[in-house]
Regions:
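Sec-dependent signal peptide recognition
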Residues: 2-9
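Predominantly the C-terminal beta-signal and adjacent terminal strand-loop region
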Residues: 133-184
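Gram-negative (and chloroplast) outer-membrane scaffold detector with strong preference
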Residues: 44-140, 180-181
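Residues that define the transmembrane beta-barrel architecture of outer-membrane proteins
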Residues: 21-23, 34-38, 74-78, 116-122, ...
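Outer-membrane beta-barrel domain signature
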Residues: 27-31, 67-71, 111-116, 164-170
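Sec/Tat signal peptide C-region and signal peptidase I cleavage site
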Residues: 15-20
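Solvent-exposed loop/turn segments connecting transmembrane beta-strands
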Residues: 24-41, 59, 67
Length: 184
């Protein structure tokens, strides 16, 4: 009986360990530096060279500068995508494609105007994942996305809230500059 229990526990540990190497959880350290944007993503290996990833970003914060200027990069973002890894999943170079949706409100970062709206689109990215240990990687990436802005309004400033531009339009933007900590 004792041998059966030990064998069962050993089998579960082996199965769990092998499964854990096919899944990852990561967070973008540079994202946290972007006015405290909370971000998390989870990935799973679909094949030797393909992985699937889902994730999101959330930033409810608004800051006041000493000059009285409000600064914010508020957002709710979700995405799902796949990555192609020429070497092995979660190791080395990769290319990615994703679908993304975002609701945002930002002001005071690059200009005084207030930009609010919702958008969806498709993104392309590339990067390199460096293996630190068996369970920890650092992921470097850069990418962009394009799509459609809907429910979009651009105001002259936060105080006057005079509408400068409104309505749907298309966009292309740099999106992912990431240095992520990945745990497998």
């Amino acid at each position: 009986m004792k041998r059966l229990v030990v064998t069962g526990i050993l089998l579960l540990v082996i199965l769990f360990t092998s499964r854990a190497q096919h899944m990852s959880v990561s967070t973008n350290v540079l994202g946290w530096a972007d006015y405290g944007t909370i971000n998390l993503s989870a990935g799973v290996s679909l094949a030797r060279h393909i992985s699937f990833e889902v994730g999101g970003q959330y930033n409810p914060f608004s800051y006041q500068r000493q000059s009285g200027l409000t600064v914010r990069n508020q957002q709710k973002t979700t995405f799902a995508g796949v990555r192609y890894w020429p070497w092995y999943v979660f190791s080395g170079w990769w290319l990615g494609v994703k679908g993304q949706w975002s609701e945002y409100s930002r002001t005071g970062i690059w200009r005084f105007a207030v930009d609010e709206g919702k958008r969806y689109g498709v993104g392309l990215s590339a990067g390199y994942t460096w293996m630190i240990s068996k369970r920890i990687n650092i992921d470097f990436g850069i990418g962009g996305w394009g799509g459609h802005l809907y429910d979009h309004t651009l105001y002259h400033c936060l105080k006057c809230m005079e509408i400068r531009e409104t309505g749907p339009k298309n966009f292309i933007a740099l999106d992912d500059i990431s240095v992520s900590l990945m745990i497998m």
